[in-house]
Amino acid sequence: MFKNAKLPPEGTPAQARYAVVIDPLIDGMTGAQSVTTQAMGVRLTKMMHEQYPQFDVKAFSAANVAKSPLVLIGTFTGVNAERKTAGTSEAYRICLALADLRSGKLVSKGLAFALPDSVDPTPLAFFRDAPAWSEDPATEGYIKTCQGTKAGDPINPLYLDRIVAASLVAEAIDAYDAGRYQDALDLYTGALSTPAGNQFRVLNGIYLANWKLGRQQQAETVFARIVDYGLDHQRLAVKFLFRPGSTAFVQDPKLSGPYPVWLKTIATQTSGGGKCLEVTGHTSPTGPEPLNERLSLLRAEYVKSPLEGASPVLAKRMIANGVGSKQTMVGTGRDDASDALDRRVEFKVIGC
């Protein structure tokens, strides 16, 4: 990819060295950063330093982004034997793209495949701890810029319009992963105040930093915004963790301690909006599928029940469904923190 980069970009003068920033690589389905995506970023930086001196790697910061450098992005996407994202991941498709902010176009692309044994999908702390997932235009734009494109194509506007906020988010994630929760909160709050800062991952970050700092009331307030965001985008996946093979939540208070707050907030935000919801349980692809379907339905009903208890008006506006492992997002079948999203409970807005 580096060797084939079309430099200088059309309409720009040649340079002895080209500034490059790396917007951290992510999982192509969930948008999460993992042990492997982080390691790949380090490896690419080392490669440019040692083999491609024409590239001058800079920190991914708002100040450096303002100078319109090249931006390196990439995705790791689990695929099955048919190279599709459904079902169990039997390989990983690695997509890399080098984008020029000055011209607004891609200058190079790279594609490779890796076996699962060489990939550690364990999410970094922020993504492991994030309470919920929803479709986020910022992440969607990143993925669409990398996947299904070729050199010379324009950078997806969903990504380009949010890259300043993305640089602040990257710094905030690093601060959270390092346990610097006040710094993380300040950075997430700063990202939120930018023109394109109202992003799902930003709200997740403000919630998590407040919770870690012991500010439960502030965390509850932000979780309400998380719920509203998900419902506004028609889909909210919440990481309720259950005991293996059971409909009961895990007993570890570090994991399930916030669940009463989540349930109360979901009930409050849903009951006031007049929306109808399908509550859908999911499982990872381990065990017989008929049992997975039954278990996922029971878990959906287990979550639905306290919502109706907190707000009786929801009884006529919610249905429960279970889809087993038909809609995995990770697909590793590891049944640990790396594939928690495969065991999510999802709230989808449906017609009343």
Question: Which residue ranges define each predicted feature?
Answer:
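Periplasmic peptidoglycan-binding/anchoring modules of Gram-negative envelope and division proteins
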Residues: M1-P13, T247-T280, S305-G309, F347-C352
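Short, surface-exposed beta-strand segments enriched in small/polar/acidic residues
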Residues: Q15-G31, L236-S246, L263-A300, M318-G331
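Alpha-solenoid helical repeat scaffolds
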Residues: P123, V169, F200-G205, A237
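C-terminal/domain-edge helix-coil "capping" segments
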Residues: M1-Q15, L101-G190
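Periplasmic OmpA-like peptidoglycan-binding domain that tethers envelope proteins to the cell wall
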Residues: G31-L44, Q217, V250-K254, H282-C352
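A structural "domain/chain start" motif
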Residues: M1-V42, K150-A165, A170-E171, A224-V227, ...
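A short, hydrophobic beta-strand-centered structural micro-motif
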Residues: A19-L25, E50, F55-A99, G104
